[in-house]
Amino acid sequence: MKESIHGPILSLNHGTYAIRISGRNDLKSVEQWYRMTKANNFSEFREAMKIQGVPMFNTGYADKEGNIYYVYNAKIPKRKPGYKWRSIIPGETSTNLWTEYIPYDSLPQIKNPAGGFIQNCNSTPYLSTGNMDEINSLPAWTGIETHQTGRAIRSLELYGLDSSISRDEFLKYKYDHTYSKSSLISKTRDKYIEHMKSDTSSVLRTGLDLLENWDLSADSTNRAAALAFLVLPKAFKPEDLKYNPDSVTKKLKQSIRFLEENYGTIDIPLGKVFILKRGQKELPLSGGPGLLRAVYYKKLDKKYIAVAGDCYIQFVEWGPDGKQQAWSIHQYGSATKDKSSPHYGDQANLFYQEKMKQIR
């Protein structure tokens, strides 16, 4: 592969491009991961993070001393002003060549926020505690997200508004199945239903009524969620909430036909259509895209199979005496590729029931 001062070169039929990637030639990630796992306290952990060998990933920290910490871990280039950095920039000059990075200490981060919790769901770091004034901000040219995902909104509604959270409440919130009324899927539903108020088509009316009365729950027994999942998630562009009502109507017609032809009704329980599949097991799942119980699906014949979202989950707590307890779950089991192993799918039943096993 050819190289330029900016990085590797790609020659395509519409042009020749050089790609510059943060940390491309940095081999310190292994050292950083090692030091993070060997850290005995917050100071050692933060020193490991300052290596900046790992160029990405939101990072959270907690310890037996009661400390919690969040950092928007990123190797962000110090870019020169005057260029549209969200677009393709000229490659025939070195004047736009960046060689330095934002220092670790300047990244958005916070230790022990007043609210007593941290969260980030691939959303803006500035609202990781629910209070934008608590976390230092950087200029817009850094490219840091400013949007809130549905999971982040719901996380702040649940964890952020509860001043005293028990273990059971913590897990209940993590497995929450309900979309916020402020989520994009809720806003899209409401906007589309309002747009279709004047439509009296008998073909669509039943489907529209089902969507309008949907309580935003993605419990496996919910009878409106299946239609909602088939119609709404791809109906909008997250960055601007713009959508074409005609394309939504087309998707609604297709989804009504699919459910009626395969299940005889459009108000089929979600878990009959959207499932966890492992070997011969087919298990009804609660949860969906953009929820704290995150599940993303792919169509396979007449069913939609979970392919992404929640996977390995670990829950750790320290008692007043500093004693640690931990629980975990994997959507399948510890032998992810060995179909002959008893551990190929032995955790699937616990996973779909939203239970965890204690680590001993």
Regions found by a protein language model. Name each.
Residues M1-E194, T200, L204-R360:
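C-terminal/peripheral segments of proteins
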